[in-house]
Amino acid sequence: MSRSLRKGPFIDLHLLRKVEKVIKTGDKKPIRTWSRRSTIFPKMIGLTISVHNGKQHIPVFISDEMVGHKLGEFAPTRTYRGHSVDKKIKKRY
């Protein structure tokens, strides 16, 4: 479900402060965050943000195509291992 246009984009204040601090200092270290709900802004382009997926932090390099999307879209939380094989029809020779 998309966000209403009258509400505008959302970013957590603590993440915005970290981004501005990294831009000001020019540090290349990834920013660790648990804020999957924050929208990617143009000022984040070129930064690496480590997004938590519930188990570990996934490093995400921000490019210009990602602007407007949420950080959580790039750190999947579920692993898909495929459907189980039907044990009755293993191999027919």
Swiss-Prot record:
UniProt keyword RNA-binding, yes or no: yes
One GO term of the biological process aspect: ribosomal small subunit assembly
Record keyword rRNA-binding present: yes
A single GO cellular-component term on record: small ribosomal subunit
Superkingdom: Bacteria
UniProt GO molecular function: rRNA binding; structural constituent of ribosome
Any Pfam family hit: Ribosomal_S19
Keywords (A to Z) from UniProt: Ribonucleoprotein, Ribosomal protein, RNA-binding, rRNA-binding
Gene3D superfamilies: 30s Ribosomal Protein S19, Chain A
PANTHER family linked to this entry: RIBOSOMAL PROTEIN S19P FAMILY MEMBER, SMALL RIBOSOMAL SUBUNIT PROTEIN US19M
Family (UniProt): Belongs to the universal ribosomal protein uS19 family.
Function: Protein S19 forms a complex with S13 that binds strongly to the 16S ribosomal RNA.
HAMAP family from the UniProt entry: Ribosomal_uS19 (MF_00531)
Protein name: Small ribosomal subunit protein uS19
Organism from which the protein derives: Blochmanniella floridana
Organism ancestry: Bacteria, Pseudomonadati, Pseudomonadota, Gammaproteobacteria, Enterobacterales
